[in-house]
Amino acid sequence: MEISINKEKALVVFSGGQDSTTCLFWAKKRYKEVVAVSFDYNQKHKLELECAKDICKKHGVEHHILDMKLLNQLAPNSLTRADMKVDEDAPKDGPPNTFVDGRNLLFLSFAAVFAKQRGINNIITGVSQSDFSGYPDCRDVFIKSLNVTLNLAMDYQFVLITPLMWIDKAETWKLADDLGVLDIVKNETLTCYNGIKGNGCGECPACKLRKNGYVEFKRLYK
């Protein structure tokens, strides 16, 4: 039996941060119809959902927010608990306390259920192995494994697409520049674990990675 894949539609897993926003505009260049889905897991940096909503509204992207607050009950971490301070540096052993067990597994699984109902095969996510910050669920091997599992679980042909998988933050900034959305990514996104839009707090690991990448981008490409 021939498998039919709709190449005109794509679903973007969209947090409102640098990486997923870059992926959103990457998708808009390649697909006729782009839908974005975000997840509310009671994150402290909840302003990211407002950023996601605003970006989608401004640029004509259909946007949905799914309730995933159950994840906060299952996996205590510094992104959801006010009494836990965000690790400023990666620990020597194990992932940092900003890692949310099962987050990408659950997000991509729920995104796949949503996509199937809409007749969408292509699911785009901004994970990167080059800058994976010690998060095991950002690795290429995980994405490939999950892609197979989702296809088997739902008897459907999903294609998990990772435009940033093998590029670093400097190259991600360059991609945003090439797409003509550098200012949008720089000013309208939220990457900061402490919930500060744009350049962020400058102290958390996400802000350091973002800033260092931007400095390197300016040095190499501008």
From Swiss-Prot:
Involved pathway(s): Purine metabolism; 7-cyano-7-deazaguanine biosynthesis
Keyword tags: ATP-binding, Ligase, Metal-binding, Nucleotide-binding, Queuosine biosynthesis, Zinc
GO biological process terms on file: queuosine biosynthetic process
Subunit text: Homodimer.
Assigned protein family: Belongs to the QueC family.
Natural source organism: Clostridium acetobutylicum (strain ATCC 824 / DSM 792 / JCM 1419 / IAM 19013 / LMG 5710 / NBRC 13948 / NRRL B-527 / VKM B-1787 / 2291 / W)
EC number: 6.3.4.20
Protein name per Swiss-Prot or TrEMBL: 7-cyano-7-deazaguanine synthase
Free-text remark on how the cofactor is bound: Binds 1 zinc ion per subunit.
Enzyme superclass (EC): ligase
Catalyzed reactions: 7-carboxy-7-deazaguanine + NH4(+) + ATP = 7-cyano-7-deazaguanine + ADP + phosphate + H2O + H(+)
